[in-house]
């Protein structure tokens, strides 16, 4: 499973998490919101997957503007996170 949200002004992706532990059968949490307003990066005091090191799989510490392209083919899905300046910055399977 995957859960996408977009309130924090940074890009971050967790490992698959179930309950309070990393678990390959769990949900991947993706925040896709670094564009438009000022970007935060992953340095705040608030709790997010990227600030909890055991859960973080990828975080945008440089606060680059990105979008995510999700490709679904039958029962499989993959995602590529892209930026205008850097091209592909993250790739993962769902």
PLM region spans:
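Metal-dependent phosphoesterase/phosphodiesterase active-site architecture
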Residues: 1-2, 8-94
């Amino acid at each position: 499973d995957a859960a996408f949200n977009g309130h924090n002004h940074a890009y971050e992706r967790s490992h698959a998490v179930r309950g309070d532990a990393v678990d390959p059968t769990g949900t991947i949490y993706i925040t896709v919101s670094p564009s438009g307003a000022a970007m935060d990066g992953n340095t705040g005091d608030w709790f997010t997957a990227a600030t909890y090191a055991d859960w973080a799989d990828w975080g945008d510490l440089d606060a680059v503007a990105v979008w995510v392209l999700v490709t679904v083919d039958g029962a499989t899905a993959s995602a590529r996170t892209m930026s205008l300046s850097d091209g592909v910055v993250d790739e993962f399977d769902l």
